[in-house]
């Protein structure tokens, strides 16, 4: 067997073996979703909820290692940073901070991340949609800061 053949066999064995490493793809119970106008709710669900809620639509590739490890990690990190399904768990100051950070990241084009938009065309936001989300964040910050 040639070196190339051995390397190919080792790579295949590694990929097959990686499938045996379990990952936990969960959608915990929803505590209370964020209340937003219908237009904003639709944008949030389309572009944010897969990582920032407990309503993740797990794609087929979330079942194939090593990509599954990255997807699960991103969802867990997203929920830690901002979980729209646990909105009531945040006090007013936390909500204002999370909304401020969200508005900044949306304005800078950091959210949704480029690699998510690459495989989720529906998560690509137009300039008008970004502005609508930023305006809603600003209005919510004002509302919760009273």
Regions found by a protein language model. Give the residues of each.
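C-terminal capping alpha-helices of c-type cytochrome domains
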Residues: 109-110, 117-145
